From Swiss-Prot:
Annotated GO MF terms: GTP binding; GTPase activity; translation elongation factor activity
Enzyme kind, highest EC tier: hydrolase
Region of interest called G2, as start-end residue ranges on this chain: 60-64
Subunit organization: Monomer.
Protein name: Elongation factor Tu
Species assigned in the record: Oceanobacillus iheyensis (strain DSM 14371 / CIP 107618 / JCM 11309 / KCTC 3954 / HTE831)
NCBIfam families the record matches: EF-Tu (TIGR00485), PRK00049.1 (NF000766), PRK12735.1 (NF009372), PRK12736.1 (NF009373), small_GTP (TIGR00231)
Length: 395
């Protein structure tokens, strides 16, 4: 059977279902695929097809995630759903499943629960830009006032974590009834997807962002100059562009790209995803090192102090067997290099056990090009013991 051509005319958006255990995330995922399939937007997936998510390994961490896809009139969606709470935590911190926006599922019969709060906090810390709320199981609640109360609670909770709680869409429905084909509830699923279409912004694709390339290797070509190689992480670079060399030093230095090579061929420009060699004007072999980045001037700056959301690998995942405390000094692996850093745990937290997730403050011994949302691994003697994402820059 010939493979279908991927339709690029629609914008592509990554979403996921979040929320407390048993509030109906997987049922909703099944309902969305089923209802949209009736309207020609992909194929229906049954609950048990989604629930038996295969285990994946991302940065040495075991995560179960189900991936489904579906389409609306205007967009193509890739949707992730995780079976267990721990899978969400790991997924969001490692960035295994990128989310451009999330559908927060809250059972109208129970209201917001501890994991509802935790998923919202995590989303803020890892930079999920937008939420649409689905109040599920409304068929089990007869009292209209109670529904309004739950909606207010959810809105307040989102506001507490700096999301626009008063303005974001809240759709009421029943995923199970929609799955069973009850027309009134199928309508609510279409209403939900219309809200997702409208409210979750189309992400700026990597190609459109300011240029950045982590330096993997450096060598000099006699008579031509110094070449930095690496994979372009975002944006594009053209011959003649001015770039900054950032990280591992207090100040960034500027240079001009005088040549771009890929697979031994000369190019006029390179874009996100390309593995290239960039020839740099007036830069000596000693001026640039692995672990630095080439970037569009002014687009990213070097920092040493930041707050981060971190998942600590369990013993079974090959992590530490013992807890760690404040002043723990592991290596932080950013893009292509390790830098030593000191950890400070939040007030009232004495230690962190393997398998926990925690917000911590880090101070690196040398500055690295970082920004909110930059991901890293924590390593000890070459093995990964944690995975994290920068939630805010301190200095």
């Amino acid at each position: 059977m010939a493979k279908e051509k991927f339709d690029r005319s629609k914008s592509h958006v990554n979403v996921g279902t979040l929320g407390h255990v048993d509030h109906g995330k997987t049922t909703l995922t099944a309902a969305i695929t089923t209802v949209l399939a009736k309207h020609g937007g992909g194929e229906a997936r049954a609950y048990d097809q989604i629930d038996g998510a295969p285990e994946e390994r991302e940065r040495g961490i075991t995560i179960s995630t189900a991936h489904v896809e579906y389409e609306t009139e205007t967009r193509h969606y890739a949707h992730v759903d995780c079976p267990g709470h721990a899978d969400y935590v790991k997924n969001m911190i490692t960035g295994a499943a990128q989310m451009d926006g999330a559908i927060l599922v809250v059972s109208a019969a129970d209201g917001p629960m501890p994991q509802t709060r935790e998923h919202i906090l995590l989303s803020r810390n890892v930079g999920v830009p937008a939420f649409v709320v689905f109040l599920n199981k409304t068929d089990m609640v007869d009292d209209e006032e109670l529904l309004e109360l739950v909606e207010m609670e959810v809105r307040d909770l989102l506001t507490e974590y700096d999301f626009p709680g008063d303005d974001l869409p809240v759709i009421k429905g029943s995923a199970l009834k929609a799955l069973e084909g009850v027309a009134e509830y199928e309508e609510r699923i279409l209403e939900l997807m219309a809200a997702v279409d409208e409210y979750i912004p189309t992400p700026e694709r990597d190609k459109e962002k300011p240029f950045m390339m982590p330096v993997e290797d450096v060598f000099s070509i006699t008579g031509r100059g110094t070449v930095a190689t690496g994979r372009v992480e975002r944006g594009e670079v053209k011959v003649g562009d001015e770039v900054e060399i950032i990280g591992l030093a207090e100040d960034a230095s500027k240079t001009t790209v005088t040549g771009v090579e890929m697979f031994r061929k000369l190019l006029d420009y390179a874009e996100a995803g390309d593995n290239i060699g960039a020839l740099l004007r007036g830069v000596s072999r000693e001026d640039i090192n692995r672990g630095q980045v080439l970037a569009k001037p002014g687009s990213i700056t070097p920092h040493t102090n930041f707050k981060a959301e971190v998942y600590v690998l369990s013993k079974e995942e090959g992590g530490r067997h013992t807890p760690f405390f404040s002043n723990y000094r592991p290596q932080f692996y950013f893009r292509t290099t390790d830098v030593t850093g000191v950890i400070e745990l939040p007030e009232g937290t004495e230690m962190v056990m393997p398998g926990d997730n925690i917000e911590m403050t880090v101070e690196l011994i040398s500055p690295i090009a970082i920004e909110d949302g930059t991901r890293f691994s924590i390593r000890e003697g070459g093995r990964t013991v944690g995975s994290g994402v920068v939630s805010s820059i301190q200095k």
